Amino acid sequence: MAAHLKKRVYEEFTKVVQQQQEEIATKKLRLTKPSKSAALHIDLCKATSPADALQYLLQFARKPVEAESVEGVVRILLEHYYKENDPSVRLKIASLLGLLSKTAGFSPDCIMDDAINILQNEKSHQVLAQLLDTLLAIGSKLPENQATQVRLVDVACKHLTDTSHGVRNKCLQLLGNLGSLEKSVTKDTEGSAARDVQKIIGDHFSDQDPRVRTAAIKAMLQLHERGLKLHQTIYNQACKLLSDDYEQVRSAAVQLIWVVSQLYPESIVPIPSSNEEIRLVDDAFGKICHMVSDGSWVVRVQAAKLLGSMEQVSSHFLEQTLDKKLMSDLRRKRTAHERAKELYSSGEFSSGRKWGDDAPKEEIDTGAVNLIESGACGAFVHGLEDEMYEVRIAAVEALCMLAQSSPSFAEKCLDFLVDMFNDEIEEVRLQSIHTMRKISNNITLREDQLDTVLAVLEDSSRDIREALHELLCCTNVSTKEGIHLALVELLKNLTKYPTDRDSIWKCLKFLGSRHPTLVLPLVPELLSTHPFFDTAEPDMDDPAYIAVLVLIFNAAKTCPTMPALFSDHTLRHYAYLRDSLSHLVPALRLPGRKLVSSTVPSNITPHEDPSQQFLQQSLERVYSVQHLDPQGAQELLEFTIRDLQRLGELQSELAGVADFSATYLQCQLLLIKALQEKLWNVAAPLYLKQSDLASAAAKQIMEETYKMEFMYSGVENKQVVIIQHMRLQAKALQLIVTARTTRGVDPLFGMCEKFLQEVDFFQRCFIADLPHLQDSFVDKLLDLMPRLMASKPVEVIKILQTMLRQSTFLHLPLPEQIHKASATIIEPAGESDNPLRFTSGLVVALDVDATLEHVQDPQNTVKVQVLYPDGQAQMIHPKPADFRNPGPGRHRLLTQVYLSHTAWTEPCQVEVRLLLAYNSGARIPKSPWLEGSEMSPQVETSIEGTIPFSKPVKVYIMPKPARR
């Protein structure tokens, strides 16, 4: 019995010792991490001079500090702060305290008392300002702690009387960021505190230092951004600052006046030295208009930009901005009848041609002039004639915004916008054209205005010309002479710049469809028809003749009497153009002929609900594929893929979703075919052909998943997870095929290890989405991960093969809006049989013009590939300036590709195509573990692969041997 008790005692003692060993091991693991505070303390103690201490602090600032080490580091810094006499070192310590208080996971309320205490005893103004900045960082980190906010506001108020402008600036900044907001509170103290903050800040509008005045205005604007409603009394204070000597103050005051005018637009304010009253928004509009003539171009730009957002202004004040002569000698202008009546009633004698023209008049008191009229008068005229092009651009943008909200103002500002088409700066001309296009629905061009607009077609800039073509597409013309003038000028443009052909044809298409009644009387002249004589048939290869036909045919679509004027050859030309240029020539009901329909039958009308319902039903039906036998599953997938592809052809609005779903089902079909039992039941050497089939299927699945991930815009994270999961299955299939055809075990170790690393990487990147992947391939892999890590390659391959067959078909959630990226190469057309000749060894420039649809970040992803007959491939990276953005989801690529090669004996064709570069690492969501890992910054910008997304164009070239 005693021996048994002794044995039990030893057993219990042994268990206790094991627990102690675990604790000791844990402590050792923690102690391996060096202490930041201890290292900093040792460095500061080693410093023999303030310069050394400052150097150590600068080195420490470059190293990251963990949240659990921040408090110890702060204590060391504060301890050294009290000992330090040099202000530069104290300044750096104060800066470090502010940086450390922003550390994620650290609550800075424990250092606030120390920061306030050292603030009370500090004498250096620079250190004071830095300490206030630290307190601002602490207060911003603790927004819910009202007591802390109030305490910091009190500290800021006490130091507002400091003689240094930097300290006062920081105090005002702290008040603007931490001042209490007005809410539904019951205590009067909180409401009064909010009002006091505004009053305290407003008192510093008249500070002697302009930097403090600017900081006070910005603090008031910060209160507004945080949700505090500013008082109307601030308006008068801000108006006085418009005449300040410093541009920073005037610029901030303009912004504050705009804010108050948006808060109290309908409030009534008196006009100085007058019995009249006016709406506050009108008064503010006049004052901001006055600042368009400010001496500083920065203030003028800001004033012009703010004018565009003041849509509540009265129409008569708005119209004053376009008339310089509204004020006569800074007086209110009276009508001619009133002036004549006053002259005759005065009885003044005149020796000149005009009655009373030399009569004495009272001296004008410029200080008593009504500021509203003198401010708003001609503001936009001054802005559009400014010497700085930035001001002119801002004025044009403001005109656009106001004209969009007021059709009457749009008509009145039309002349001024048309005049801006002749500006010396290309950017201003381009902005003016874009502005007119935005307001084109509210205006109709007169002939003189149209003449000025069409003169821009001679501009050497392609961007200007194409922007003008876009403008003419949506412009209303008043007369048939205007249509004829536009056609003549566009044909001149076509002759001078043949590369504008497609843009001009598109312009004439919309010009004809918008003005059918104006085109009708011009048809006999344009087609050169005669009532009695047959005229010669024009050349169908002439781009100018095609342009005329495009104009006429689009006008005939809504004008049923026009086809009767067509001759026989015109009808033949219509049939030809309807086939070759169907996107420019509409379907017409011609006499004696059937309606030429489009590719979509007329009885099919796009209804979103039935098509969407059919799409959903097809996908729901196919997700039951795992319950069918392999042959039935393959047939169901094939039929569904065919239906989805046809649906995408018929319904353009569902093309992206249908193609996306069909591609995913195609990947699943390839996987099912590759996993058929007959391929794997016999030894691999007897089925090399089937192994090649499985390897090709894995490769194709990889390519299709990259297309799904990077060729479609609107793909969300939940779709990326499913796509990456499918790619992981393809990699597993590739590993299985490689293992069956590889001799020896050694090469498999590296491949299996790499695959398991990819599985682990997938888990870490998409850990939040793993619950949605139950019973999937990766879910079963993760369950067996410890076993896989310890298994031999042969066992790993067997497990992968079993899990691939048993994995379920994952449901792919469809995004709300998804579009497939596409590109069309316009130039080179690839139709010419004349080779492009150049000397071998030198280069020749090939112009490339392409339209891009639904491409994300084209500046970094779109590449141009040139494939030579000998197999050489050249990839060109277009410059960011080569891309244009004509509309949402659309881009235009205009670039030059330089070709070079050795001498050839005869001309051959090179292929030009557009590629979409991708990097799968850039789409992976950022995880905390990834941020801490040491990853190369080049991974984000490197190119992992490319996807062709345009049809190749073949160009004849002929490198000639150099002459000797």
UniProtKB/Swiss-Prot annotation:
Main location per the UniProt record: nucleus
GO MF term (any one): protein-macromolecule adaptor activity
Covalent link (Glycyl lysine isopeptide (Lys-Gly) (interchain with G-Cter in SUMO2)) residue numbers: 792
Compartment(s) of residence: Nucleus; Cytoplasm
Similarity field: Belongs to the Integrator subunit 4 family.
Subunit structure of this chain's protein: Component of the Integrator complex, composed of core subunits INTS1, INTS2, INTS3, INTS4, INTS5, INTS6, INTS7, INTS8, INTS9/RC74, INTS10, INTS11/CPSF3L, INTS12, INTS13, INTS14 and INTS15. The core complex associates with protein phosphatase 2A subunits PPP2CA and PPP2R1A, to form the Integrator-PP2A (INTAC) complex. INTS4 is part of the RNA endonuclease subcomplex, composed of INTS4, INTS9, INTS11 and inositol hexakisphosphate (InsP6). Interacts with BRAT1; interaction is required for the assembly of the RNA endonuclease subcomplex.
Protein's name according to its UniProt entry: Integrator complex subunit 4
Source organism of this protein record: Mus musculus
Gene responsible for this protein: Ints4
